[in-house]
């Protein structure tokens, strides 16, 4: 301590108390300042230590806050995207609705029928009952427009689009195509004549007189050829597949109709050399079920085959068989039946003009061509009969058409139809006698059928002999004038009486039915475990069943009319009494009152 003070003295200091005090005061002040600074630094260090210790927690809070803010930002961004999408969708809907409103607010478009075009780019169209000259949109090629084609028109009636041809309208009958080929004379529903224009489809395809055409009456255009459905319902053009060999018991009738129908077609030159006119018509008459329709079908088939053979297979070698369903010709509307008859003969003329033989067959001819004035509640025959007469007389100019009629009441057909020059040839198809019945049975009972072993053994296994014996036995049973075969007792107007047997009412249809019954018996017997094959016993039983089934069929209200239909002619019948006994012969015959009921026709 003494050193410094010595030093101080040596430096020239006097060592006075005032100086020391000031120095001490300066030291104390400096010390206080340093102490204050140290304290401040210590507090700063402590604060920094606290902050350092608290920094991780704050960092985590900040990180969490940052994450929350990012999540909120993402949510806001997604919401903003959805809002943008919603706005875009709303804008699209507004645009679509505006287009729909604009579309619905557009004026309606019209339709017209194209008629013709001109060099200046205008065209004539028919629309709303008026013929107009209009312009064409640049999007439509005028050269593609066809006469009769439908076109679309805008509000200004300009062509803006092409359409197809009209598919609906009125059906008319083509009478003839007029000069120039683009017009036609047609007949309407009431036979009213009018001239129409032919649309392009009809100009491109062949049409003939008698064709049915579809027209649009307002524009006067015909668009389409319609198949003749109304005629197709009444006729069968294809030749039936029935030959003479399938018909039994009618040899003389077949020969007569072949001479009348086939010879004039096959030997035209000979007929011309002999100045012989071929018959224009044939009437087949007789009781029901005796083969009139079969003969007509067979002659058409035979004629077709012979024409083909004569031409050596050249050409089609066809014949046409127009089978007219008589009652279906009748129509409640005035003039319709006559129109149908004209259509039928028009079809016949078309086919005949092609060089092919045509047979027009009227079945049940008495139902539509009755004697004029005989109608009870109508006089429709007064116009139908003259229509047929005019058509038959018109056939005179044709070489390949013949009319065949079939009826079981020829007395009801108008005499003008039956006179020579119309239905020239009249062939009676009678009920089969015993020989004819054997021939008919032979068509259905043939050696190829399964035969009962016992019956076959009786004839030494000879199938031909067995079948012949079966047929002979059942025919003898049918045609025997025995007590059990008695059917009717008829009383004539003069008081005479006559007993009629079942054989007097036999027919080919009845024989076919008897054989069918017997075959069914054989089938049932085999199904139930019995032996297989047709036997004589079944044929005899079927014959009795057929007789028994028909005992109530005679018409007793008007016996004379019934007799005429059944083929009995002569003295007028006033009373009918059945004589049928039971299957065991124990039931008594019974009389049927003439006022009982209307009955049926046998």
UniProtKB/Swiss-Prot annotation:
Family: Belongs to the AAA ATPase family.
GO BP annotation list: modification-dependent protein catabolic process; proteasomal protein catabolic process
Domain of life of the source: Bacteria
Organism the protein comes from: Frankia casuarinae (strain DSM 45818 / CECT 9043 / HFP020203 / CcI3)
Protein name: Proteasome-associated ATPase
Keywords: ATP-binding, Chaperone, Coiled coil, Nucleotide-binding, Proteasome
HAMAP family reported in the protein's UniProt record: ARC_ATPase
Coiled coil stretches, renumbered: 19-106
Region annotated Docks into pockets in the proteasome alpha-ring, chain positions: 601-602
Record flagged with keyword Protein biosynthesis: no
Basic and acidic residues bias spans: 18-31
Gene that encodes the chain: arc
Entry comment, domain topic: Consists of three main regions, an N-terminal coiled-coil domain that binds to protein Pup and functions as a docking station, an interdomain involved in ARC hexamerization, and a C-terminal ATPase domain of the AAA type.
Its biological purpose: ATPase which is responsible for recognizing, binding, unfolding and translocation of pupylated proteins into the bacterial 20S proteasome core particle. May be essential for opening the gate of the 20S proteasome via an interaction with its C-terminus, thereby allowing substrate entry and access to the site of proteolysis. Thus, the C-termini of the proteasomal ATPase may function like a 'key in a lock' to induce gate opening and therefore regulate proteolysis.
Annotated region (Disordered), positions in chain: 1-31
